[in-house]
From Swiss-Prot:
Residues annotated for ATP binding in this entry: 111, 148, 181
GO biological process: pyridoxal 5'-phosphate salvage
Annotated function: Pyridoxal kinase involved in the salvage pathway of pyridoxal 5'-phosphate (PLP). Catalyzes the phosphorylation of pyridoxal to PLP.
A Pfam family the protein falls into: Phos_pyr_kin
Subunit structure, interactors included: Homodimer.
Catalytic activity: pyridoxal + ATP = pyridoxal 5'-phosphate + ADP + H(+)
Protein name, UniProt field: Pyridoxal kinase PdxY
One GO cellular component term: cytosol
Positions that bind substrate: 9, 44-45, 222
InterPro entries, alphabetized: PM/HMP-P_kinase-1, PyrdxlKinase, Pyridoxal_kinase_PdxY, Ribokinase-like
Keywords: ATP-binding, Kinase, Magnesium, Nucleotide-binding, Transferase
């Protein structure tokens, strides 16, 4: 069994961060070591919440604790998502280096949570800069949305062709694999949800239905990053992992849309996370 150290947010109510990613990864047969960067009552898009940002020292202390019982070498991957403070970025990069020193085959997926095309800035001061200047260079895989694609590449990205160029730029900055979680307004079709996956071997595009919500669910990117990493650790090829992830997330979104509720319906859609009913295919475009 593969093991993922998942360092991201936790909400008591609803689905975001580790709450959105842990159960789906476990469904795929991966053990998840969840380390929370924040503990909030609910996600921040409600406009109000209670809770705390974990002290930056706690990340290193917890990693040390796992190491001291001799288990850190069993960690196959580090996944980072929503980060509560700029100082935590450094701690997460250090945590990955510690894991890598115990297991040289361990990989790092950075979900560079900075913002959302329709939700604006959602992270603390300094986090964006830390992700760009520190985390990206150490990540094997990075999973930006459109806002994050622009920030990481330093390009404007106003159309499909510019998105392709931005992905190519990011591949020169450290990551070996780039999964663009949502092309949003720079996609080819306004009524579709479009994604990219890129390596040095090429760029693949996948398109699936775009569901309409009164309020967009939160945690979709967290779910996407977690499923992609779990699929890779389970031995799927890059494209198999990309397709399974896109199809499983599509099914979760469809179940959520049909339910008429705000929060992701991960439990209700659990069978489709394991075996998606959707069969959308990735097409190589470069």
């Amino acid at each position: 069994m593969k093991n993922i150290l998942s360092i991201q947010s936790h909400v008591v109510y609803g689905y975001a961060g580790n709450k959105s990613a842990t159960f789906p990864m476990q469904l795929l047969g991966v053990d998840v070591w969840a380390l929370n960067t924040v503990q909030f009552s609910n996600h921040t898009q409600y406009g109000k919440w209670k809770g705390i940002v974990m002290p930056k020292e706690q990340i290193g202390e917890i990693i040390q604790g796992i190491d001291e019982i001799g288990e850190l070498a069993k960690c196959d991957a580090v996944l980072s998502g929503y980060i509560g403070s700029a100082e935590q970025v450094t701690e997460i990069v250090n945590a990955f280096h510690t894991v890598k020193s115990r297991n040289p085959n361990a990989i790092y997926l950075c979900d560079p949570v900075m913002g959302h095309p329709d939700k604006g800035r959602i992270v603390a001061d300094g986090v964006k800069e830390g992700l760009i200047k520190q985390a990206m260079a150490h990540a094997d895989i990075i999973t930006p949305n459109l806002v994050e694609l622009r920030e990481l590449s330093g390009l404007r990205v106003e159309n499909f062709e510019q998105a392709i160029e931005a992905v190519k730029v990011i591949l020169t900055k450290g990551p070996k694999k780039v999964l663009v979680k949502h092309l949003s307004k720079v996609g080819k079709q306004a009524d579709k949800f479009e994604m990219f996956f890129a390596t040095e071997e090429g760029i693949w595009h996948i398109s699936r239905p775009l569901y309409q919500f009164d309020k967009e669910p939160v945690g979709v990117g967290d779910l996407t990053a977690g499923l992609f990493l779990a699929n890779l650790l389970n031995g799927k090829s890059d494209i198999e992992a990309f397709e399974h992830t896109a199809n499983a997330v599509n099914d979760v979104m469809e179940v959520t849309a049909n339910s008429g509720v705000y929060e992701l319906q991960i439990i209700a859609a659990r069978e489709f996370i394991l075996t998606p009913r959707s069969q959308y295919k990735a097409i190589k475009i470069v």
